[in-house]
Regions:
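A beta-strand edge to alpha-helix "cap/lid" segment located at domain peripheries
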Residues: 3, 34, 48-116
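Short, well-ordered alpha-helical segments enriched in acidic and aromatic residues
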Residues: 7, 17-30
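Amphipathic alpha-helical repeat scaffolds
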Residues: 9-13
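Histidine kinase transmitter module recognition
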Residues: 14-15, 57
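Short histidine/acidic/glycine/proline-rich micro-motifs that form metal-
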Residues: 37-40
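Short beta-edge strand/loop motif at the mouth of beta-sheet-based domains
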Residues: 42-46
């Protein structure tokens, strides 16, 4: 397993544990994050503000990763299913694809899209 895949997997593992402080260390001030369900964010501060708000809307949440593949050097593709229970008790489930781009040992970009 390449260092790129290991770092990308670590990002998902930390997300499933809700370890936002540790997740922030994986990004830089020039990292970007784009999601079909959100917006686009620049830098670890903006990314983590978004993630903090996202996580705070759920009692429980997690990503079940079905497939991981380094599609090109430095680019890892995850197929996943997200499941969460909101603070109102609503069950949210969606399948998606997530590209994690790693450069110089940090996450440079995350691109999340719905599978449909």
């Amino acid at each position: 397993m390449t260092d790129t895949v290991q770092l990308a997997k670590k990002y998902f593992e930390l997300s499933n544990k809700g370890k936002l402080t540790e997740i922030k260390k994986l990004f830089t001030s020039s990292s970007t994050y784009s999601s079909a369900n959100k917006d686009i964010f620049l830098g670890s501060d903006q990314i983590m503000d978004m993630q903090t708000k996202f996580f705070s809307g759920f009692d429980t949440l997690g990503w079940n990763v079905h497939n991981i593949k380094e599609v090109k050097p430095g680019i890892v593709l995850f197929d996943f299913t997200f499941t969460g229970i909101t603070l109102d008790g609503e069950v949210v489930q969606r399948s998606g694809k997530e590209y994690v781009i790693v450069y110089n040992g940090k996450i440079q970009h995350v691109e999340v899209s719905n599978k449909d």
